[in-house]
Amino acid sequence: MDTLHHRFQQFQKTIWFNIFCYLWTGIFSFLAFAPVSLTHFVWIAPFGFFWLSLKYHGKYKKLFFHGLLIGVVFYAISFHWIIHMAITFGNFPYVVAILILLFAGLLFGLKFPIFMMSFSFLSGKIGRHSVWVAGFCGLLSELIGPQLFPWYWGNLAAGNIILAQNAEITGVYGISFLVFIVSYTLFQSNPWHWKEIIHSKEKRKQYLRFITLPALLLLTFIVSGIFLFKKWENVKPVKSLNVLIVQPDAPLSFRDGREIKESIEALMARIEKLTDEGAVRLGKKPDLIVLPEAGVPFFSAHKTEITTKVRRMYWDRFDSLMFLLANRYKANVFFNEIDAGFKGAPSPRNLRYYNNNVLYDPNGDRRDSYQKKFLLMFGEYMPFDFLYELSQQTGRFEPGLTHNLIRYYTPRYYTLAEKEKSPKGRHLGWTDTETFNHEAVRSYYETTRTEVSETGKFLPLICYEVILPEFVREFRTAGNPEFIVNLTNDKWYGATTESDQHMELGRLRSIELRRWMVRSTNSGISANIDHLGRFVGNKKTGLMTAEALSETIDVIDSPPTFYTQYGNLIPWLMLFLTGIYYLNLLIGIRRGKSS
C-alpha cells in the first residue's frame, strides 16, 4: 500500500495526472448522468476537482485554467451532441461545430473553475470546516455559474428516487450541496489513511468527528426523502384523465427528394393513424390528445389577417385535422404551431413570430394558447443581428408576454346515443380535407356540437422551458395547475444522449410541483411522469420513431409546494449565512495577523 501511495504521489507531479483528473470527472459525471444513470458514480466524480485543488493550492490562474479544461472535457463527453446540433440546425461545417462545442465548454463550464478557485482560497485561509467549505463552494458555483443547457450535480444524484424527493423543499441546488459534502468526505476517506486510522485511537476520534456532520446530513436527506416519498405515494388522486401522446417524427425540413406536398401529406396521414391506433390501445376515448412541438412544422392553424395575407402560414387542412381529431373523439387536442403578430404598428419591420401552443376543445373550437417565453439562444433567436448571416436556419422568434395556464374541457352528454353520435353515419378523415375546405368540415360536424364545461387547468411548457426550475415557478402567479404538459422537439440532436438528458433534467419539475407531467416529443423520448418522478407504467417511446403512447394519468389536488412558493430560499439562505460566517472568520484572521 505504501509503495502504491508513493507511486501515486509521483504520478501527481506529472502533466498526465492533470489529464487523468479531467477524464476522471468527465467520465464519472457522464456515467452518473442519463442515459447511463449509474447514479452512485456522482459521489466520486468531483474527485478531479479536489486533486487539482490540492496540487495547485493557492495558484489561482492555474486553477482557473485547469477548471476550464475540465469544463471542455465534460462537455466533449456529456454534451457531444452539440456537434450534431450545430451541423443539423446551424448548417455549420464539422470543424466549426467542434469549435462551437469547445467554446460552449469554456463559457458554460465556468462553474468548474469557480468551484476550484473558491475552494482553494477558503480551505487555505480558514484551515478548518473543509467539508462544509466544499459544500459551500459547490453550491456557490452552481448558483452563479452561467449555463446555456442548465444541469446541476443534484440532477445526477436525483437518479436515486429517494434523494430526488428532497427537490420539493431544497430544489436541485440542495441536492448539489449534498453531493459535494459527501464527495469530499469520501475523498478524504481514501485508503492511504486507513492504516493509521485503524491503529491510532486519536486518529479514529478525529476521523469520527470529521465524518459526523456529513453522515448526519446524508441521513437527513435519506430520512426526509423516505418520508416525502411515503407521504405523496399515499395521496389519493381526485380524478384521472385518459391521455394520448402522439409522436409523429416530423421532418426538420422537406429536403429528402420528395415533393413538399407528398412529405407533408404523409406526415398528416401518419398523425391521424397514430391517433387512431393509440385510442384503440387505450380502450376508451381519450380526454386529451397531445401533439409535440413542431409536430406539424412551418404551418399555423390560426387564421388571422397576418397568417393569411402578410405571411401565408395558415393552412386550412392543418386546422381541419386538429378539428377532426377533437370531434372524432370528443377530446381536447393540444398542439404546437407557428403564430405571428405585429409588435407595435403594422409594418414588415414589426412582424414577429411566436412558438405557440394552443388547445382545441371537444367541439374543435380554438381556446387558450401559450406563447413560448423563454427562447433558446442560437436556436430561436440570435443575440446580435449579424449572427443570422452565419446561421440562416435560426428563427427570429419573439418571446410571449404571459405565464398563463391552459383550460381544458369536458363534453356534456345526455344519452349514450348522443355520446357515440357521428355525423351522417361516418367521421371525416384526413383525405377528406382535400375536397372539404375548413368551413365545410365545420359545417359537417355542426349537428354533433355539444355543451362543454371547463374541467381544470394545466401548466404548458415548450421544450427547453421544462429544465428551468426558476422559470417554471413563475407560473405560480397564474394559479395552481392540475398537471404539466411539455411539448418538445429534440429531433435536431439526432439519436444522441441529449433526449435522455433533456428528459432527466425536466423530470424534477414533477417532484418540485408534485404534479404529473405529460411529455410529448416529436421524435422521442415521450413519457408520462408521476408526482414522485417515476415513469408511469415504466413506458417511454423510442428515439427517431413514430408512435403513440396512451396512459391514464392522475390529478393530485394539493396546495402549492414549499418549492413552488419559496423556490431556492433554503440554498440561498444557506449560502448567505455560511458566507457571512466565513467572511467574519476571514476578517478575524486578518486582524489577528495585523496585531
From Swiss-Prot:
**Principal subcellular localisation of the protein:** membrane
Topology term for the membrane: Multi-pass membrane protein
User: Does Cell membrane count among this protein's keywords?
Assistant: yes
Which CDD domains does its entry note?
Answer: ALP_N-acyl_transferase
- Look at the named UniProt entry and state the broad enzyme category this protein falls under: transferase
PROSITE patterns, alphabetically?
CN_HYDROLASE
Listed EC numbers: 2.3.1.269
The entry's localization annotation reads:
Cell inner membrane
Query: Which InterPro entries has this protein been placed in?
Result: Apolipo_AcylTrfase, C-N_Hydrolase, C-N_Hydrolase_sf, LNT_N
**A GO molecular-function term, please?**
N-acyltransferase activity
Active site, per annotation: E293 (proton acceptor), K372, C463 (nucleophile)
The alphabetized UniProt keywords are:
Acyltransferase, Cell inner membrane, Cell membrane, Membrane, Transferase, Transmembrane, Transmembrane helix
Q: Which residues form the CN hydrolase domain?
A: 241-555
Membrane-spanning residues where? 30-50, 63-83, 95-115, 167-187, 210-230, 569-589
- Supply one GO CC term from the record: plasma membrane
Q: Name one GO biological process term.
A: lipoprotein biosynthetic process
Task: Enumerate the HAMAP family for this protein.
Answer: Lnt (MF_01148)
What family, per the record? Belongs to the CN hydrolase family. Apolipoprotein N-acyltransferase subfamily.
This molecule's function is given as: Catalyzes the phospholipid dependent N-acylation of the N-terminal cysteine of apolipoprotein, the last step in lipoprotein maturation.
PANTHER family xref list: APOLIPOPROTEIN N-ACYLTRANSFERASE
Protein's recorded name: Apolipoprotein N-acyltransferase 2
